[in-house]
Amino acid sequence: MNEQTAAALRRAQARLDSLDLYPRPVSLRRVRIWHVRWLFRLPWFRRFAGYTMWPLILLREPLHETSDDLVCHELCHVWQMQHHPLRMPLSYLYRGYSANPYEVEARAAVDATRR
């Protein structure tokens, strides 16, 4: 992992560590950030700037063009999956996106920790 990625994850981790959402703090072990612009050209992904799949954070734009708020939001999803590895991703099948409690929680985590 390069230093820019490590620094972005540490900043997001520090923000989330100030919250008491889950019994264990978010772990950065195995977390990776990939810039995959082509993925966000696919119809399902066009509306997103970032997407998380377990310890993998996928970004539309390069990390140096991505806000700390987005990295924090996506790392919150990593944290959620560390505690609910099946329930969290499956919730999108029956709750959808915007009203999904995990999305609401990730947006609230960003708002609560915004400087």
Per-region residue spans from a language model:
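Polar-ligand-bearing catalytic/cofactor-coordination segments
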Residues: L56-C76
